[in-house]
Structure formats: structure tokens, C-alpha cells
Amino acid sequence: MPPFFAEFTESVFRHFRRNEPDEENSAICSEKMSSYGAIGVDDNDTDPLLDDEPPRRLPPAGGVPIGRRRAISASQIGSIPSQSAATRQPYLFTGGLGLRDESLLSLHSEDDLHREHNNALRYRLYNRLDPGGEHLTMPDHVLPPNLFSILPFEELKDVSGKQGSIVTIFSIWNTMMGTSLLAMPWALQQAGLVLGIIIMLSMAAICFYTAYIVIESPKRLQDLSVDPLLAEFSDVCKSLFGRIGEYCAVVFSVCVLIGGVIVYWVLMSNFLYYTGAVVYESMQPNSTTIPVMENKTFTCDVYCPEQTSQWTIPQWEKQLYDAVSEMEGGETGDDSWSFDKFWTLRGTVPIYLAFALFPLMNFKSPTFFTKFNVLGTISVMYLLMFVFSKLLECGVNMDFSNPKSIHYVQLANMHFPALSGTLTLSYFIHNAVLTILRNQKHPENNARDLSIGYCLVAFCYVFIGFTFFAAFPVQRSCISDNFLNNFGAGDVLSSTARLFLLFQMITVLPLLMFLVRSQLFYAIFGQTWPGAIRVIILNVLLIAVAVGFATFYPNVGSILRYVGSISGLVYVFALPAMVYIKQSEAAGTLTPMKKYAHYGIIVIGVANLIAQFVI
């Protein structure tokens, strides 16, 4: 028991002892209290503040046994001796039929009423004390809110276990600010400067509105078997659309998470490869150059990793050829122990990661890894400062008039669906927003906090995208879908970013795997841990898929936009709009304008998906 709690209880005891008139009354107070004035206590409950075995007293002759509470008639009152004034009656006892005020006063003197009132307060106080902030026991399929919190330790929360608006806002911001941040300059280049910024802000508004529908939907349910305070969006879909709605929500939520695992694996392989290359090169005697600097296209410490002819040949075909060449040894085939043979970006490094990280995926509880959630906030801050420092170093390099200039900027581009698809996943928080807001100290501020969170995310995306785009000193077509690839491995700031992000992603990946298995296994088996064998099999399959993408299709931007457009169609556009229409129709508040507007949201999602394969 914490010291402050012991001191508080002792002070309460001293206060109540002062109000107990004599030893006899003190013994009476030690017996079991009535449940009429207490909070849901049976006849078998005992006061936890008293001794386990209170002394038993024999009842007075002809009186009511102490410790037993039964109604007495008016005819029996006169037969009770005078010492019966010390016997206990139910709290808030007002007498039965035929009792006059004089009889009631004879049963309860002023001292007795005061004493029993104090004991009732004591009993209620200790039954209402919160044992640590966990007011409700959540079912297994509901994710713990601290999974997304930026507070690394429970001690940083208040005594109620709740979090304020500032922590809630930054938890929303931290959850959305993911890997798509690295692809934002590339996505902006695909859409053009002006059109891209318009799409960024428009998608933020649409995704915020559908997320708002998600957080309001449990409140409008009337027949939900799960408590609305604990309901997930899949429960809402099940209530309105049956099992099909629940399975759609779960399946596409899992698809988003699997897409996140794949992108994480591609990026971790990239970061580990370049970090290892720098370490190896620095250990060589008389090393003055770093291999990636042989490109010789450095301008303002930025280089073009691929030629601008990337649209002339199928990109997947070129990458497949490169991956096979790397696994066969490439030009270093004559040297069987060459570092370049055993350290390849699309061959060996993703496999090394699989062996190194597989044990971390099989923990039953990921609580330990939630302590590192704050690293996400630090990494985002570092990237913001990193990009801003490059703007100061390189300056603004934009030319709106000369198409032949290397600084020429397109205001609009036909490849804008790459940006809209990426943003659908970038602004995706719909499967976690209810969990995050469940710990909110002031639920009435949920809409405000969600809107502020989306504004912060939109600002960061626009800032990263525009700043890097404006400062890029060569052709914009050279911008990589991971903008750290535009910096040599010898660049100190970019190398630090790679190493820091690698560690941060290693701590987040087990959380993603936990979310995948929790939602998937609960939908199939009704429990989040159906056995170690099933968990291991699922993790092996997921890692195999991730390694395959990292080897044969390591395109972060393309993976983001395809996963975002497919899963976003269902979870961001269709399901929230259909839930709103269904609930408004049941409440009688659905107007034709509202109906067509929400159907329009679904149409936007369909068009976004089709455009990924057309343009």
C-alpha cells in the first residue's frame, strides 16, 4: 500500500473513532453493516476496514440479535429493553407502518444516528476508492489504450488513470505520423505543387470527418450488447450490418496493419543496409570515400539515386532483375567472401532482419514495447528539423516559367492519385481512435481534440513535403519515395536519422504484429492468444510476406498508395458513411442532402481506388 494511502486511511480512522461514544458502540460498529445505505453489498459482505473476525456479542434478553437485521412490528417495540437503543438498524431506516415519531426517536438517539452515519460514509468511501484507474475490465478483443499513448510510464498519468487533452492530441498525432512521412515529398512531386497541397488539405478534412463519425457511432446505438464506452467500430458495424459488417471492418483493419508491417520491413532493411555499409567502410584501412558517393551527382549534399528514365521501363521488372542479380552475387561472384555478396539490400539484409526480430514477435503481451512510444514523437521532431536544416543549407530552388530548367516546378501533375492513395493511409486512424479516446479525462472534448490532432498531422505532412520539394536542387523526378535515399550514407544527419528510425521501428513492429494477431484471432477463435503454435505460424507467414516485398518490390510509395486506396475505400470512406446513413435513418434525421453527400464520400473512395490502376 502506498504511504500516502496508509496515512489517509489512518486519518479517516481517527476521525471516526472520535465520533464513537463508548466501547460498546465501537464493538457494534465492528460488525457487518447494512446494505441498504451502502453500495451493492450483500448480507455476506464484510467491512474490509475491520478485523476479519470481529468479536461476537450475545443479544440482550428479548431483543433482536446483533448482526441480524429484520423488520419489527409496532407491537414488539414495547418489549425491547432500553439497551436495545444500541442495536443497529438499516441505514436510512425510517420505520415501518404504525411507528410514531416518538418510537423512531427512541430507537435512534442523536448520537446513534451520528455514529451510524459516519460508519456509512466510511463504508461508501472505501468502496468507491479507485484501485489504480482501471474502472472497467475490458474484454480481450479491446486493445489497451496505453498501446497508443505517448506516455511511457503509468506513473506519468494522473491518479484516475486518465489522460488530459494535450496527451490525447499528441497520441493521435503520434499514431498517424508514420512511415508515409518519408514518402510525402515524392507524393507531392507526383501531384504537382499547388494541386498536391490542395489534395493534402482536402483529404485531411474528409478523413477527419469520417473519423468523427467513428467516434460518435457508439453513442447512437441502442441495442448494442457491448457497453458503448468499450465498443469498437467493428462492434458498431456488427450491430448495424450483421456479421458481414463486422468481418469487413476487421479484415480491412488487418490489411492496413499488414501493409504497415510490409512498409516497416522495407524501410528497416534499407536503414540497416546503409548503416552497415557505413560501419564497414569506416573500418577499412585508408578509407577516404564511401561507396554510395561514387554517383558524383551531389549538389548541396543531395543526389539522384535513379535516373529520370524510370517511367520508360516497367519498374517492377527492373527491380526483379536487380534482386535476382544481388542474390546471385552480381559482379562480386568471383570473391566468395566479399562483403558486398553477404550484405545486399534486396537479398540478404531482409533475411537477417527476419532471424533477428522473429523472437520479438512472439511475446504474449507487448506492454514492454509501449514504453518506447515516445520515440515516435522524437523521430518526427528530428525529421522536421532535418528537412528544415536542408532548406537553410540549399535554399529555395523553384522555377515556374522555364520547363527545361532543372528547378522547374509543375503546379499540377496527372499522377496525383499517387498522393491521394498515400494520404488515405497517412490519415488513417479509424481503427484506433476509439481506443485512444477511451482514456480521455474529458470525453466532451473528443471532437475538438481529434480536429486539433488532424490539423497537426496535416501541418507536418505539408511542411515535410513542401520544404523538401522546394529545397531539392536537382530535377524533382529524382525525389525518392524514401527521401533519406536522396542523401549519401556519409551524410551525418541522414545516417543519424536512419539509425534512430531503425531502432524506433524495431520497437513498434512487435506492436503492429500484436494488433494483427489480436484482431485476426479474436475474429476467428474468439480469443487473442489461441496458443503459441498458431501465433508462431501467423508470424512466420507475415514475416515471409514482408521479406518477399523487401526483396522483390521495395517501393514504399507504391505499397502505401495501394494499401491505402484499397483499405481506405472500406474503412475510411464506405463504412463510416454507411453507418451515418443507417443511424440517421433510424433516428429520423436523414435528409436527402445528407444522404447524397455521404454517398458522395463513398464515390470519392471508389474513384481513388480505380485511379491507382488507371493513371
UniProtKB/Swiss-Prot annotation:
One of its GO terms (molecular function) is L-amino acid transmembrane transporter activity. The chain crosses the membrane at residues 166-186, 193-213, 247-273, 342-358, 368-392, 414-434, 452-472, 492-512, 534-554, 562-582, 595-615. Residues 41-65 are annotated as: Disordered. InterPro entries: AA_transpt_TM. It is found in: Lysosome membrane; Late endosome membrane. Residues 1-165, 214-246, 359-367, 435-451, 513-533, 583-594 are cytoplasmic. Disulfide bonds join C304-C478. Residues 187-192, 274-341, 393-413, 473-491, 555-561 are lumenal. Residues 175-180 are annotated as: Important for arginine binding and amino acid transport. It is a multi-pass membrane protein. Glycans are attached at N286, N295. One of its GO terms (biological process) is amino acid transmembrane transport. Its main location: membrane. Pfam families: Aa_trans (PF01490). GO terms for cellular component: late endosome membrane; lysosomal membrane. Lysosomal amino acid transporter involved in the activation of mTORC1 in response to amino acid levels. Probably acts as an amino acid sensor of the Rag GTPases and Ragulator complexes, 2 complexes involved in amino acid sensing and activation of mTORC1, a signaling complex promoting cell growth in response to growth factors, energy levels, and amino acids. Belongs to the amino acid/polyamine transporter 2 family. SLC38A9 subfamily. This is Sodium-coupled neutral amino acid transporter 9 homolog. It comes from Caenorhabditis elegans.
